[in-house]
């Protein structure tokens, strides 16, 4: 399974940083990372709601994690009302200073790097700020964001600059996302590009057998269906028949412990802390929208905590999907507007020059098959018989469903999507 995501924000002339440079890092504040994780969750659900309302009949796939981290870079460089607006959208009300957030951000990066070295699943997330080489970058930004800062020549080497950014994205996503930026998207007027690239490649803890993958119907309505390659297996998985969400919630774990270290006779969650969570509503016209309206960070947490091991037959479509999103209108609906407005944007912690975010893009790609899934992103049938969902013997994803790639350790929604119609998805 391959999953990839890229978030990009291009900055044009029209940024200041007291909050980042005014206070030294305090190692005692690093435990605030738990608040950062909760903010990421709330942001993820808010972004999902905006996107699904904008595309009510389409398939959806994106990485809220990637977008959140690209916006964190903007937040670290912002000041004044721009900073306040970003803090609200990123759910940073718990932090009394920008340095608290940066400390949590640094610890998250350290923890992610340490965990990656100890597990077979590949998950990486990289942040980068590409500055114009003639743009004055504050000494504070160079010191505090040293790993993220790179200066390039947008003005006289425009095409080479575009290639540099695209090459960085391709490298971070293991060549899954190439040519993110087209020829007209970097110009001599570009002053700065904020980027995050996320990549995940994982094997199912319990793999589907290819010989059991057969053509089966996927229903988009009671009278309309398409044949899909349906993967099937029987096993013990964590399941919650969720009355609050009015859906069945199943966790398909990835292998995050090397086989030599796996515990024998363990529960489904002991050898994995990253899963694809499948949220399957009943099959009627408004059930998916009903579930989405009930979903938030707390309801997702509660549902996952209440799950119990069940022996169950699972059917899941095999699919591959890529989505490109223009983030400006999505972020505007979430409450981000000032950083795009040249007349009011302030990024004083990065530079003394007046600049604003000109454009923002997100690309996400996922492949799900019998072995597992690969994802990358870059940010430049059952029915209710009563009010309670029926306990299933089968979990058949043969009608529209929601999926979330969830990291239990950090309580992060890494990727999320809605599978509505297989006609527009590669199988």
UniProtKB/Swiss-Prot annotation:
Keywords (A to Z) from UniProt: Glycoprotein, Immunity, Melanin biosynthesis, Protease inhibitor, Secreted, Serine protease inhibitor, Signal
Signal peptide: 1-18
Glycosylation sites: 224
Tissue-by-tissue expression: Expressed in nurse cells and oocytes. Expressed in wings.
GO BP annotation list: imaginal disc-derived wing expansion; immune system process; melanin biosynthetic process; negative regulation of innate immune response; negative regulation of proteolysis; negative regulation of Toll receptor ligand protein activation cascade; regulation of immune response
InterPro entries, per the entry: Serpin_CS, Serpin_dom, Serpin_fam, Serpin_sf, Serpin_sf_1, Serpin_sf_2
Annotated site residue numbers, Reactive bond: 386-387
Disruption phenotype: Larval lethal. Larvae develop melanotic spots and display an increase in the activity of the activated form of prophenoloxidase 1 (PPO1), phenoloxidase (PO). Larvae display enhanced activation of the Toll signaling pathway, with increased Tl, spz and Drs expression. RNAi-mediated knockdown of maternal and zygotic expression results in adults that have a reduced lifespan. Wing development appears to be unaffected, however after emergence from the pupal case adult wings fail to unfold and instead remain folded and hypotrophic until death.
SUPFAM superfamilies reported in the protein's UniProt record: Serpins (SSF56574)
Localization (cell): Secreted
GO molecular-function terms, A-Z: serine-type endopeptidase inhibitor activity
Annotated Gene Ontology cellular component terms: extracellular region; extracellular space
Function recorded in the entry: Serine protease inhibitor with activity toward trypsin. Negatively regulates the Toll signaling pathway and suppresses the expression of the antifungal peptide drosomycin. Its negative regulation of the Toll signaling pathway also results in the inhibition of the melanization immune response via the phenoloxidase (PPO1) cascade. Essential for unfolding and expansion of the wings after emergence from the pupal case. May regulate the Toll pathway by blocking the proteolysis of the Toll ligand spz.
Family: Belongs to the serpin family.
Protein name: Serine protease inhibitor 88Ea
Record organism: Drosophila melanogaster
């Amino acid at each position: 399974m391959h999953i990839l995501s890229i978030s990009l924000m291009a900055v044009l002339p029209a940024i200041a940083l007291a909050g980042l440079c005014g206070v030294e890092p305090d190692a005692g504040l690093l435990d605030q990372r738990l608040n950062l994780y909760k903010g990421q969750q709330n942001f993820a659900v808010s972004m999902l709601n905006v996107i699904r309302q904008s595309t009510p009949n389409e398939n959806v796939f994106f990485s809220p994690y990637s977008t959140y981290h690209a916006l964190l870079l903007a937040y670290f460089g912002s000041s004044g009302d721009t900073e306040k607006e970003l803090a609200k959208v990123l759910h940073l009300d718990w932090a009394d200073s920008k340095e608290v957030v940066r400390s949590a951000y640094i610890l998250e990066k350290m923890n992610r790097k340490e965990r990656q070295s100890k597990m077979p699943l590949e998950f990486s997330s990289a942040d980068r700020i590409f500055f114009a080489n003639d743009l004055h970058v504050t000494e504070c930004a160079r010191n505090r964001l040293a790993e993220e800062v790179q200066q390039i020549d947008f003005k006289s080497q425009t095409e080479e600059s575009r290639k540099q950014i695209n090459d960085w994205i391709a490298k971070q996503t293991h060549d899954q996302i190439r040519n993110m930026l087209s020829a007209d998207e970097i110009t001599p007027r570009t002053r700065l590009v904020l980027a995050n690239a996320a990549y995940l490649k994982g094997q199912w803890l319990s793999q589907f057998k290819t010989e059991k993958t057969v053509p089966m119907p996927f229903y988009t309505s009671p009278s309309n269906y398409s044949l899909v390659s349906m993967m099937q297996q029987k096993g013990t998985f964590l399941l919650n028949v969720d009355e609050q969400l009015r859906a069945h919630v199943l966790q398909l774990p990835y292998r995050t412990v090397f086989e030599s270290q796996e515990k024998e006779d363990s529960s489904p969650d002991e050898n994995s802390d990253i899963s694809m969570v499948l949220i399957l509503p009943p099959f009627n016209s408004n059930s998916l929208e009903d579930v989405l309206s009930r979903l938030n960070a707390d309801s997702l947490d509660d549902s996952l905590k209440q799950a119990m091991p069940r022996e169950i037959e699972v059917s899941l479509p095999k699919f591959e999907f890529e989505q490109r999103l223009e983030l400006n209108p999505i972020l505007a609906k979430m409450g981000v507007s000032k950083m795009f407005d040249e007349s009011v944007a302030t990024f004083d912690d990065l530079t003394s020059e007046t600049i604003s975010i000109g454009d923002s893009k997100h690309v996400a790609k996922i492949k799900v098959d019998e072995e597992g899934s690969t994802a990358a992103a870059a940010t430049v049938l059952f029915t209710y018989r009563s009010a309670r969902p029926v306990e299933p013997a089968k979990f058949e994803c043969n009608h529209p469903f929601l999926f979330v790639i969830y990291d239990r350790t950090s309580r992060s929604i890494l990727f999320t999507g809605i599978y509505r119609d297989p006609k527009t998805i590669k199988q």
